[in-house]
Amino acid sequence: MSTFVTRRAAFGIAATAALASLTACASDIRPLSNQSTPDTQRSYKGELKFDSYESRGTYVPATRSKKAENPPKPIPPAKMRAKTTEGMYAAIGFWVASFNYLLLSGDIEPFRAVDTNRNDIYKAEAFVELYKNNTGWMYGSDSPISAELTEDHPEKVGEQQYRWRISSRYHKEATIHYTDGRELTMASLSSGPGDYEFFFILEYQDGVWTVRNEPAKLTTSSPSSSASSSSTSV
């Protein structure tokens, strides 16, 4: 019983506190005419989209009786290196796609490429162990967690740091199946109905954007950062 409770708590942390990740679906990322300046005209508000995947054979979705086969593996998009708003968008898309891929495969490798400071990796280790120990898997949805950006552009909060508010939710059919017969829906991990509000915190380090998440209620806005949000300067 203690093991189950521990895993349940870990999933709650991983999926809820770890931003309740976003959706891994088709991309709308488009190139800027000038990569040295931010795209201040385009609105990025809305459903997050991503399409940078590695072909790994025929994808067979998971069911209650078997885990997924060959789920599409996200690869870091080149735009993640662009010091622009578009670069931040690409990094967030990769973070979310990597988290959903982890839920379906137990493979944490892509996630490490965007969480280079290991801010959220420890929250995801329960999923790695679930697959590694052959004690269970996720089924019911190709994107267990989805979300959308609720702001047109990110807000600058430091010399090399930005934050971007998102609204996230669990897929109602996403279910953790344990090999001993128990099942746990992602929705049951929720502390209440509705969506979750989070911030993605982005920082440009060593030529690439790194991403972590932070509950919106724990983040406060300063006058200087609010003033800079209307025109993102990267």
Go through the PLM ranges and name each one.
Residues 63-140:
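Core segments of small alpha/beta cavity-forming domains
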